[in-house]
C-alpha cells in the first residue's frame, strides 16, 4: 500500500482513465480491483495526479450489489482514505462519454494515461475486445477511435486483459500513442501465481513505483528520474514468467521519452566513444560526423549512453555495409571505394 498524503497542489496537465469491466459476478475476481487500486495509488501518491482528473470505471459502478466472485461488492474506495473513487459502471456508453469529455477538455499540453484490466475476448474474425459489465464486449475497432479523437500531448495505454495485443494495430496511425499489452491478439493473459494481481500489470506498476537502493525506480534503467513507457514495458516483460508474450508499440520513439511524470527532454550532452579510439563530444541536438578515408575498410562499433536515442544516416560515399539503428547501438563496416569519402552521421534526437 502507498503512504497516504495530502497535497496542496497537483499536476494540472495529467489525466487518467482506469477501466475494469469484470464481466459478471462469477468471474469478476478480486485481483482486478487490486490491479486498479495499485495503479490508482501510484498515480496519486507517486506521480502527483489530481483525483479529480482520474476517472475510474469498474464493474457495476457505485452499486452496492454483489459484483465479485467472492460474494461481496467491490469497495468504492481504492486508496483507503475514506473517499469513494469508483465513479461509473463499466458500460460502453460510460466509456464513450468519458473519452468524449476528455476530447473536449484536453489540449496539446496535457497527458492521458489509460489502464485496462479484467477479461478480454477474441472472436472468429480475429477481433479483440475488452469485456465490460454484463458481459458486454467493447471491440478495439470501437474503443480506438474514441481515444484517437483526444488531442493530448501524449497518450500512454497499458492493457492487461486477455487478447489485448489486438488493440495495438488500431493506434499505429496515431503518433501520440504509446501502448503496452500483456499478450498478443490471440493469446490469454495470466494472473500471478498467488492470484492477487495480474502478472504483466503488476510488474508494469512495480517498474514505475518501487524504488531500488539507488533511490531511482526499479524500471528507470538509465536513472534519469523518468521511468519511460518503454522502460516500464521492458521491466514488466522481462519479469513476466507466465505463458504470455507482452507487446508494445509507439511511433517515432515516443515511448523512450514518455513517462507518468511527463516527457523527458530529448536533449542531453556527453561523450560518444568509438571502437577505433576516437572520441566525439556532443551536446544537445548537435550532429556528429566522421569521415572514413578512401580505400580503407574500417569496422566501427559505437556504444552510446542508454538514455539517448539516436538517428543514423550515411550522408555521402559508398559504404560496403552500413547498419543503421534507432536504438542505442549501431555498427558500420565501411569499404570505401568511391571517389569521395564516406560520411556517417549520428544525431542525438
Question: Where are each of the predicted segments found?
Answer:
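Boundary/activation segment at the start of structured domains
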Residues: 1-110, 264
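Solvent-exposed segments in extracellular or luminal domains encompassing
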Residues: 328-342
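Low-complexity "stalk/linker" and mucin-like segments enriched in Ser/Thr/Pro/Ala/Gly
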Residues: 307-327
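A short, glycine/acidic-enriched catalytic loop
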Residues: 73, 77-83, 87-90, 105-107, ...
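Acidic, glycine-anchored loop motifs typical of Ca2+
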Residues: 28, 32, 68-86, 128, ...
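Solvent-exposed loop/turn segments at secondary-structure junctions
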Residues: 22-26, 60-64, 118-124, 135-137, ...
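Short, compositionally biased P/S/T/A/G/V-rich stretches that sit at domain boundaries
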Residues: 262-291, 319-322
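Active-site-proximal C-terminal subdomain of hydrolase catalytic domains
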Residues: 37, 155-251
